[in-house]
C-alpha cells in the first residue's frame, strides 16, 4: 500500500531553480504529492518577521498517477542586500499545519554552502539485516541535518545520481521477470510493450520514489535544504 507518513501528502520537496542576478530574486519551488480532493495550502514569510503577513503560494497540478496528483508551488523571493535570510513556509491540510525553514543567500553573497550526495540507496545484494546494522538510509541524512543546524544552514544540496536503486524492479515486477526469462535476443526484442507493462512499471517507480524520500531525516532534509538533482542509470 502506498501511503505517506503524515497521512496526507508526500513531500514537501524544496527545489532550488535559479537566481535572477539582475533583480536579486531567488527562484525555487515546492512539490507535494497527494490524493486529497484539494491541494494543501502553503504560506511563506521571512522567519525574522514576528508579525508576518505571509504570502500564499499557488498550487499548479503538473502530473497525476492513479489517484495521486503532483502539485508544484513556485517561489520567488527577494534576496536581502545585507546578507542571508531564513524563510519559513507552512503547509496546511485537513490534518493540521506543519512548518519548515530554509536559508536564502544574500544578494551579494558568494560563499554559498553546498553539499553533494550520490549512491543514497542500498544495492540489491545488501540484506535487510545488514541495512539495519548500518543504520538504514536515514543514517547519513541524520548527520547532514545535524551539520545543517550547527553551521546555520546549507544553501543548496546537489543530488547526484543513484538517489534510489531502481534495479530492484527486474526482480520485483512479474511482467519484467517474465521478459528476462524469454529465450533468445530476438524474442525479447520483439516482445510487445503493453498497457499492463506501462502501468506496473509506472507504479513501481512511484512507489520506489515516494517511499524512499519519505524516510526519517531524508524527508526533513529535502524539505529544508533546497535541492538540484540529476539522474543516472540506477535512478531509472
Protein language model features and the residues they cover:
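Extended recognition/assembly regions associated with phosphoester-bond processing machinery
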Residues: 1-236
